[in-house]
């Protein structure tokens, strides 16, 4: 029967390939327009640029005296990677987005390599990669902007898959640990890769290797924590305690269920075909025969996906400020690898799967039209021109990246407001760590400085969002500054318009 269907199978593969080519071009065009858009793509996109800019000027971005203006809750690795390029070409929006783009593409290339090592067909491997690419560019998410998420995800994937690719040799386990620690200092939740691998080693490969991996990981992590805390004084206030202390304030079960629902709808055709695959094997009473289950990538992939789903449900998926990027970074790589591997085991996949997989790519890319970056520039050139005429501007986070590009001081990088949360040591933490009173003192001095500058009219211009009028000094602004009007600009990747108010000294 299969022999008689070969012409149709070949035709299905050809048609599928043509669709994949179309979606690849569509995604590349969208990504290029996103990267080259010369204005902010989101409200807080400038935050990471402030850390890079500090490094370029020989400063420690986690120096307590530079807080809260340089508050960075994510980690030091992303700014360190961008640093040499910024030193050569300037601390620009473009340079940062290009680095992000590189790691998005590197993650896609690595997933393709993993699939090929799992003997998945080239066409299905490309489909999986394009689905991941579309996920990482999805409108409304921060991954493709000036954000360390793509870098952290890349290191997490290396942490998980390198040992499998190298047959779990001790050398590969050590490399995995190093990438896991790098992932932690890029975005802390990317440390999940080490938990996935250590547990997988213990249960499916070798208890000895699992214990050795965990012990070495613990030792090197402890050494790194001591070294980082000593050399970067505000690091753990910014990157660890802030997030830990704010967990309860941003937890939302409603947000979790909304994201699960949206993620499921975006992948409905893939999930449907996974169900078909399972039914296919149940009714045919076939088993997935793995010569060595511990060494087979699909078992590791399912294990990693299960861990990711667990973390999303009980923690990160409840973040009220997140919109799918945790799902796309932590779950999608493993879901799509598993899906492509499964479809490849259905002999008739070019006929049975192609229509549904094309529909899923169509669903994922429906909102990714590159024209949005050219059609929504109104107001940005004028606002940028106004900024260029003044030196000392009390700023909205929205324009932080523009101030960095123009070499001007800034006062709110988009994360500044969260700095105070890093001082507290709650719950069991009180038994091990002291409250950091330096944070309270630094924040008090910051507010005092802002208020003094307003009263003395030291700001040449104030540009703030109406809702952020701001930082406890709204009355002083109205007393010493004159309202000049409002500008409305659009952030394409955020899919939001932002209004800013302009004030000049009386």
Predicted segments with their positions:
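Extracytoplasmic
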Residues: 360-506
């Amino acid at each position: 029967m299969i022999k008689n269907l070969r012409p149709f199978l070949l035709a299905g593969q050809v048609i599928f390939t043509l669709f994949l080519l179309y979606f690849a071009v569509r995604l590349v065009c969208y990504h290029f327009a996103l990267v080259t858009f010369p204005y902010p793509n989101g409200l807080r996109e400038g935050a990471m640029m402030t850390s890079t800019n500090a490094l370029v000027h020989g400063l420690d971005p986690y120096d307590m005296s530079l807080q809260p203006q340089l508050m960075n809750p994510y980690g030091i690795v992303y700014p360190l990677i961008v640093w040499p390029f910024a030193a050569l070409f300037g601390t620009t929006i473009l340079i940062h987005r290009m680095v992000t783009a590189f790691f998005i593409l590197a993650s896609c290339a690595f997933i393709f390599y993993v699939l090929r090592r799992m003997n998945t067909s080239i066409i299905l491997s490309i489909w999986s990669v394009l689905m991941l690419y579309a996920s990482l560019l999805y409108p409304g998410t921060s991954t493709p902007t000036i954000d360390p998420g793509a870098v952290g995800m890349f290191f997490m994937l290396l942490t998980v898959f390198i040992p499998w690719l190298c047959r779990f040799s001790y050398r590969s386990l050590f490399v995995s640990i190093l990438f896991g620690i790098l992932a932690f200092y890029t975005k802390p939740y990317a440390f999940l890769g080490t938990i996935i691998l250590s547990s997988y080693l213990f249960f499916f490969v070798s208890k000895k290797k699992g214990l050795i991996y965990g012990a070495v990981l613990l030792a090197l992590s402890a050494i790194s924590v001591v070294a980082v805390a000593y050399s970067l004084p505000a690091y753990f206030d910014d990157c660890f305690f802030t997030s830990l202390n704010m967990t309860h304030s941003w937890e939302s079960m409603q947000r979790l269920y909304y994201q699960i629902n949206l993620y499921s709808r975006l992948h409905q055709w893939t999930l449907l075909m996974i169900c078909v695959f399972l039914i296919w094997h149940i009714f045919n009473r076939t088993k997935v025969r793995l010569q060595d289950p511990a060494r087979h990538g699909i078992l590791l992939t399912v294990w990693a996906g299960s861990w990711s789903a667990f973390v999303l449900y009980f923690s990160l998926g409840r973040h009220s400020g997140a919109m799918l990027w945790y799902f796309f970074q932590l779950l999608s790589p493993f879901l799509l690898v598993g899906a492509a591997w499964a479809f490849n085991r259905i002999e008739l996949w070019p006929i049975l799967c192609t229509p549904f997989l094309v529909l899923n790519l169509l669903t994922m890319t429906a909102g990714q039209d590159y024209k949005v970056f050219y059609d929504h520039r109104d107001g940005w050139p004028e606002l940028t021109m106004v900024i260029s005429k003044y030196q000392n501007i009390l700023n909205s986070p929205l324009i932080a990246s523009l101030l960095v590009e123009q070499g001007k001081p800034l006062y709110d990088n988009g994360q500044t407001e969260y700095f105070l949360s890093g001082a507290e040591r709650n719950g069991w933490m009180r038994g091990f760590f002291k409250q950091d009173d330096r944070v309270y003192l630094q924040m008090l001095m910051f507010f005092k400085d802002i208020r003094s500058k307003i009263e003395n009219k030291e700001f040449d211009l104030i540009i703030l969002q109406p809702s952020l009028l701001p930082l406890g000094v709204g009355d002083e602004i109205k007393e010493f500054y004159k309202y000049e009007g409002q500008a409305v600009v659009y952030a394409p990747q955020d899919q939001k318009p932002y209004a800013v108010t302009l004030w000049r000294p009386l």
